């Protein structure tokens, strides 16, 4: 019975892949790949190293997409041949077919999402910021739990993480943290996480064991590439320096290497303290500011600056995009798509793709 179901699924996957091939415009991709290859062979191509690296990366992305599509088609054909050659009661071949169809289904779903992620910044690296909301020490602890969740998700996706700014809680957890997430489609995927995340649990900080509700916000911005850069008038900036490592002790930097930049016309404030020098911190902070200004420009119809990185106006009741309930029952529910699961431990260990994909498909 399972074999029949998977063979039926195989036919569906073949049709899905055919539709994706049309939407991908495979012929256009192959033409673009050839053009990029010629460009890379031009004299003086490496004169501008940064631009050359971007062209090389784009060429690799285009070729990888073409190769992935062709490989999936070939594997579907191979399964169909295997089915034709399979003898009656051949359990080993049946297991092989079932396993391969399941793998194909997962890979085609991923390709479908990456086809949907066609926005100008979707392929970019991402700047992920977590802020504590309502809930005191519980909320700080909740922010740290979310930090771990996203760290585990990034590890599973093969993305690398770099801490840009980190402010610990007074008693426990994290007040705020900003990370750079490096990897293809990092922004495209993580933009689905923008908003308020709500936790309900028995508080470990309450001696009476009372139930506590905590909130944290997730902001996501694309990191801009050189060809997406924007000019900022220096007179619009106020740049302050301060000592990094606010928790004190041996980690305090004795020089004022941390940088805070305020964009005066909009009131946007960005800061970075984790690079080795004031120059590097300033460079990173400027990149963050440009990303925020780009997103603000794209959402110019919004009236308030809080809308810059999602609906973050009220970090409290009724504003959450997702609820994580640990007590009196176990459930994580996304209020935008109504996708839910009782596997709370799995979610907190980074298994959030079902929420992300459902949102991107909506």
Swiss-Prot record:
UniProt-recorded name of the protein: Peptide chain release factor 2
Domain of life: Bacteria
GO cellular component: cytoplasm
Cytoplasm is among the record's keywords: yes
Matching InterPro entries: PCRF, Pep_chain_release_fac_I, Pep_chain_release_fac_I_sf, PrfB
NCBIfam families xref list: prfB
Function comment: Peptide chain release factor 2 directs the termination of translation in response to the peptide chain termination codons UGA and UAA.
A GO MF label: translation release factor activity, codon specific
UniProt KW keywords: Cytoplasm, Methylation, Protein biosynthesis
PTM annotation (N5-methylglutamine): residues: 250
Family: Belongs to the prokaryotic/mitochondrial release factor family.
Entry comment on modification after translation: Methylated by PrmC. Methylation increases the termination efficiency of RF2.
Location of the protein in the cell: Cytoplasm
Pfam families xref list: PCRF, RF-1
PANTHER family (UniProt xref): CLASS I PEPTIDE CHAIN RELEASE FACTOR, PEPTIDE CHAIN RELEASE FACTOR 2
């Amino acid at each position: 019975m399972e074999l029949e179901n998977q063979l039926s699924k195989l036919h569906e996957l073949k049709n899905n892949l055919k539709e994706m091939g049309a939407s991908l415009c495979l012929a256009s991709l192959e033409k673009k790949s050839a053009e990029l290859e010629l460009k890379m062979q031009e004299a003086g191509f490496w004169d501008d190293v940064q631009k050359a690296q971007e062209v090389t990366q784009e060429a690799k992305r285009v070729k990888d997409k073409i190769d992935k599509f062709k490989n999936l088609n070939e594997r579907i054909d191979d399964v169909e041949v295997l089915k034709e050659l399979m003898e009656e009661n051949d359990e080993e071949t049946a297991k092989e077919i079932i396993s391969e169809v399941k793998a194909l289904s997962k890979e085609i779903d991923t390709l479908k999402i990456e086809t949907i992620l066609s926005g100008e910044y979707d392929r970019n690296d991402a700047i992920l910021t977590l802020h504590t909301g309502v809930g005191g020490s519980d909320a700080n602890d909740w922010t740290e739990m979310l930090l771990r969740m996203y760290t585990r998700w990034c590890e599973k996706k093969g993305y690398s993480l770099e801490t840009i700014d980190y402010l610990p809680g007074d008693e426990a957890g994290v007040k705020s943290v900003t990370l750079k997430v490096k990897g293809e489609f990092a922004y495209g995927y993580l933009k689905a996480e923008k908003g308020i995340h709500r936790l309900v649990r028995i508080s470990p900080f309450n001696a009476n064991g009372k139930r506590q509700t905590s909130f944290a916000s997730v902001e996501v911005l694309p990191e801009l590439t050189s060809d997406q850069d924007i000019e900022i008038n220096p007179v619009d900036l106020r740049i302050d320096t301060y000592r990094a490592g606010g928790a004190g002790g041996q980690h305090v930097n004795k020089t004022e290497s941390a940088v805070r930049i305020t964009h005066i016309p909009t009131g946007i404030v960005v800061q970075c303290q984790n690079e080795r020098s004031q120059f590097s911190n300033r460079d990173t902070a400027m990149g963050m500011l440009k990303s925020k200004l780009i997103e603000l420009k794209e959402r110019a119809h919004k009236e308030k600056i809080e809308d810059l990185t999602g609906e973050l106006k009220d970090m409290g009741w009724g504003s959450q995009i997702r609820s994580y309930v640990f007590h009196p029952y176990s459930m994580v529910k996304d209020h935008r798509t109504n996708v839910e699961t009782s596997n709370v431990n799995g979610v907190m260990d980074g298994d959030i793709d079902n929420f992300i994909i459902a949102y991107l498909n909506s």
